[in-house]
């Protein structure tokens, strides 16, 4: 837990694990209030088994978004339905869903498959009298793509992105990834820096170490991770290319080197250093290693995060007596306090649209994830789990992934930005902590 004593300190081969979910998402709250949608199993037009049912991926994505609730397949009036031309609108007239996703898959060549999918506005179809003048009246989107057998899951995420954006106006985040640290104290090298698809599939290990690894942070282009490693018996900040495995040591000063986070242009890191005594916020140029001190106070300053415009940092400080979140303008150095409610507020990050801040709030001794509207300063506690920490916002600003404790074990969990939808991501072995959600990829 990021208590006052710990948050100032905590801040090789490319191993690919088979395409299964290492982090199984367990939805705990919020599905019943979601928007109903029908996802019809994609029609297979081949003589051998289909490599994977794309509709399964789409259904899981839409459910995990917290926004949609796919209908049970047994409740669909048509299950062998691949296009609008085959749709019996009368059979669908009383179906309580706002849209229908359907498609076909057929062999196209050696390890090639032609996928067609359509998104139908069912509400409009049900309200229309006299039948459509053209298919485009009901057809919200239609795509045709050739993929390989290894791309079925990825293309399912792509379809989910399209459906989500068409129906909500918000870009989908189903093709994103998460980084996190797994700790297995039974292993000789217990610390592993991992990345995986947002839903836990395609888990990959970037680094394994006998010493602690912590605080992973994505670059804006999604190609690099910054993190803290104690592999050399002291805290050091590294930046690693996740594709080439090339690593760059950015800081290795005596004392604390912690909590790195990339600037919006990807050229700098904001981080915490104690090289001059007290932990302070610095900005380091990744290419030149030049550093610039940002804060100068006798209290602890740590956990910096950039505003989307790159002109300010928010950070945690105890300069008011207890940990609270402040904002510092990089040009002037002016510091403004942002949080006042609760006993502690720490670990803040700004939503991509710049309107909200997500952070850890302690009230009555309980650590939970909270969100604050930066214009009205209204604060909402989003979670009811225990010992919550390390919130990270999805790039579309709709969900937050964070660390928590469940049945005595550190796990990851997710909550929607309105607090309505909640899910848990337990892992099979070891503990999982320090999640970081990637940008759009």
Swiss-Prot record:
Compartments reported by the entry: Periplasm
SUPFAM superfamilies xrefs: TolB, N-terminal domain, Tricorn protease N-terminal domain
Keywords linked to the UniProt accession: Cell cycle, Cell division, Periplasm, Signal
Gene Ontology biological-process entries: cell division; protein import
Extent of the signal sequence: 1-21
Any one cellular-component term (Gene Ontology): periplasmic space
Record keyword Glycoprotein present: no
Gene3D superfamilies per UniProt: TolB, C-terminal domain (2.120.10.30), TolB, N-terminal domain (3.40.50.10070)
Membrane spanning residue stretches: none
Keyword Cell cycle set for record: yes
Major location (coarse): periplasm
Tree of life domain: Bacteria
NCBIfam families per record: propeller_TolB
Assembly information from the UniProt record: The Tol-Pal system is composed of five core proteins: the inner membrane proteins TolA, TolQ and TolR, the periplasmic protein TolB and the outer membrane protein Pal. They form a network linking the inner and outer membranes and the peptidoglycan layer.
PANTHER family xrefs: PROTEIN TOLB, PROTEIN TOLB HOMOLOG
Annotated function: Part of the Tol-Pal system, which plays a role in outer membrane invagination during cell division and is important for maintaining outer membrane integrity.
UniProt similarity note: Belongs to the TolB family.
Protein name per the record: Tol-Pal system protein TolB
Organism the protein comes from: Shewanella loihica (strain ATCC BAA-1088 / PV-4)
Lineage: Bacteria, Pseudomonadati, Pseudomonadota, Gammaproteobacteria, Alteromonadales
């Amino acid at each position: 837990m990021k208590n006052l004593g710990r948050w100032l300190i905590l801040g090789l081969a490319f191993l690919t694990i088979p395409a299964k979910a290492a982090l199984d998402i367990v939805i705990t709250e919020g599905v019943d209030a979601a928007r109903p949608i029908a996802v019809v199993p994609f029609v297979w037009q081949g003589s051998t088994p289909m490599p994977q049912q794309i509709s399964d991926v789409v259904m899981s994505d839409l459910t995990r978004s917290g926004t949609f609730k796919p209908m049970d397949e047994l409740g669909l009036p048509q299950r062998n339905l691949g296009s609008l031309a085959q749709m019996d609108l009368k059979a669908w007239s009383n179906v309580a869903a706002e849209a229908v996703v359907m498609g076909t898959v057929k062999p196209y060549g050696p390890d090639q498959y032609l996928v067609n999918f359509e998104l139908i506005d069912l509400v409009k179809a049900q309200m229309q009298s006299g039948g459509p003048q053209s298919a485009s009246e009901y057809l919200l989107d239609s795509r045709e793509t050739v993929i390989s057998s290894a791309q079925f899951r990825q293309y399912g995420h792509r379809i989910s992105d399209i459906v989500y954006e068409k129906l909500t106006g918000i870009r989908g985040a189903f093709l994103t990834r998460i980084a996190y640290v797994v700790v297995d104290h039974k292993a000789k090298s217990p610390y592993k820096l991992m990345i995986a698809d947002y839903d836990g599939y395609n888990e990959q290990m970037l680094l394994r170490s006998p010493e602690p690894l912590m605080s992973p942070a994505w670059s804006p282009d999604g190609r690099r991770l910054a993190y803290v490693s104690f592999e050399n018996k002291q805290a050091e900040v590294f930046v690693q290319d996740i594709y080439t495995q090339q690593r760059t040591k950015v800081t290795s000063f005596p004392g604390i080197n912690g909590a790195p986070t990339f600037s919006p242009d990807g050229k700098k890191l904001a981080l915490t250093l104690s090289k001059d005594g007290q932990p302070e916020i610095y900005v380091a140029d990744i290419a030149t290693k030049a550093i610039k001190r940002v804060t100068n106070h006798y209290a602890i300053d740590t956990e910096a995060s950039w505003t989307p415009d790159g002109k300010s940092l928010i950070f945690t400080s105890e300069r008011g007596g207890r940990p609270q979140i402040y904002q510092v303008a990089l040009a002037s150095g002016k510091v403004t306090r942002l949080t006042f409610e609760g006993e502690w507020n720490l670990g803040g990050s700004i939503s991509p649209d710049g309107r909200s801040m997500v952070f850890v709030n302690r009230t009555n001794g309980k650590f939970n994830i909270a969100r604050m509207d930066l214009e009205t300063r209204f604060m909402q506690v989003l979670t009811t789990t225990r010992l919550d920490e390390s919130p990270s916002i999805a790039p579309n600003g709709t969900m937050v992934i964070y660390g928590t404790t469940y049945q005595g074990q550190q796990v990851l969990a997710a909550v929607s930005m309105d607090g309505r939808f909640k899910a848990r991501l337990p892992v099979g072995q070891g503990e999982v902590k320090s999640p970081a959600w990637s940008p759009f990829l």
